[in-house]
C-alpha cells in the first residue's frame, strides 16, 4: 500500500510586531527562526526595522547579498541572489535592512500602493515554509505595511501593566484603523500575544488573567476584529538569550536541557512550545527533524 504524501502547505508569513519598542521582538524572531530551521523547515527572516536593524547582524552570514529590503521595496527586486542572504544556519535565510538614510519611509508615504506594497511582493518569494518579519517598534506606515502583508501577527508583551496597556491601546487600535482594507479583499491577520522576559518577581497568572479579562470584555463588546489570544507559553528572562545573541547562535542550541533543580523551562523547551502554539500546521509534519529537541 502506498503511503499518502504529506500535505503541501503554502508559505506562512508571520510578523513579530508591537507598537512599543524594547519588547524583544528581534530576539523572538531570531530564535524562532533558528529553531524552525533546525527542525528542517525553510525559513526566511526579513528585517523590516529600518531604524534599528539588529536582526540583520544577529546571525553570521555565509553569503551576503548585495541588496536587501531597500531593493525589495523600492525597486521590486525579487531575485534571491540580489536580496536574500544566507546565514550560517542551514535552512535559515534573511533579507537584511539596508536603508541607513531612512529613505524607505518617505517612499512608502509617497507611493500610492505604499502600505500594501510588501503584501504583493512577499508572496512572490518562493521556496520557504515560513517567513518571519521583524518590525520597527513604533506606529509608522512601515509597521502598517508589515501587518497587512502578514498571515499572522505575533505581539510580544512585557510582564508589566504599562506594556500590556500599550498592547491593548496601540496594537489593537492599529487593527481598528486598518479595518477599511478588508473591504478591498485584504484580511487582517489573527493576533497572538506572547509574554516576554518573565522573571521570578512577576506574577504571570495575574498579568495573564488581567489581559484575558480585557480581551474577553472586548470580545463581548465586539471590539476585536480578528481572533486574538494570549499564548500559554511565556519566554522567561534568562541570561542564555543575551549570551546566545553575543555568540550569534539560536538560544535553543545554547540552553538545550533543563539542569537538575531548575524550575523554569530551558530555552529549547520554550522555543518548541512557542512554535507548537504559533505554527501547529508545520510542527505536526512527520518530515521534521526531531533531533536535539529537548
Predicted regions and their residues:
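P-loop NTP-binding core
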Residues: 1-294
